[in-house]
Amino acid sequence: MSNIPTDLRYAATHEWVRPEGDGVFTVGISEHAQGLLGDMVFVELPDVGDAVSTGDDICVAESVKAASDVYAPISGEVVEVNEDLEDSPELVNSDPYGDGWLFKIKADDAAEVEGLLDAEGYENSIDEE
């Protein structure tokens, strides 16, 4: 079973969300998702300043197996991207919940995060795949 940290919230589309304070949330893809994709070769990140709505495809993770869209788990504005991924996309594989984060969003409504899955809910959604 994949590592599913209990302090994060999850979208059914395998993105995780971590609060950073002041309505800013870090977003990445779960260990389960990176395991399905395999070794990352390129990550196409959104632009800082992009306004996104929940469910928008705003990022692409390309692996040796496939290219997969990454969706905005919450609405808001992209305020930072993980530029380390340009040279080291494999960080998504080696540390998906740490150095492999993708981008940060300033939420339009921070309460939207409460509608995402907790660790148990996300684990159940994986089990149903």
From Swiss-Prot:
InterPro entries assigned: 2-oxoA_DH_lipoyl-BS, Biotin_lipoyl, GCV_H, GCV_H/Fam206, GCV_H_sub, Single_hybrid_motif
Cofactor note: Binds 1 lipoyl cofactor covalently.
Keyword RNA-binding annotated: no
Coiled-coil annotated spans: none
Highest taxon listed in the record's lineage: Bacteria
A cellular component annotation (GO) from this entry: cytosol
A Pfam family recorded for this sequence: GCV_H
Keywords assigned: Lipoyl
Domain Lipoyl-binding: 24-106
KW Heme (keyword) present: no
Cofactor: (R)-lipoate
PROSITE patterns named among the record's database cross-references: BIOTINYL_LIPOYL, LIPOYL
Transmembrane segments annotated in the record for this chain: none
One GO term (biological process): glycine decarboxylation via glycine cleavage system
Residue positions where N6-lipoyllysine is found in the record: 65
Gene3D superfamilies: 2.40.50.100
Family to which this protein belongs: Belongs to the GcvH family.
Function according to Swiss-Prot or TrEMBL: The glycine cleavage system catalyzes the degradation of glycine. The H protein shuttles the methylamine group of glycine from the P protein to the T protein.
Alphabetized HAMAP family for the sequence: GcvH
Subunit structure, interactors included: The glycine cleavage system is composed of four proteins: P, T, L and H.
Protein name per the record: Glycine cleavage system H protein
Species: Alteromonas mediterranea (strain DSM 17117 / CIP 110805 / LMG 28347 / Deep ecotype)
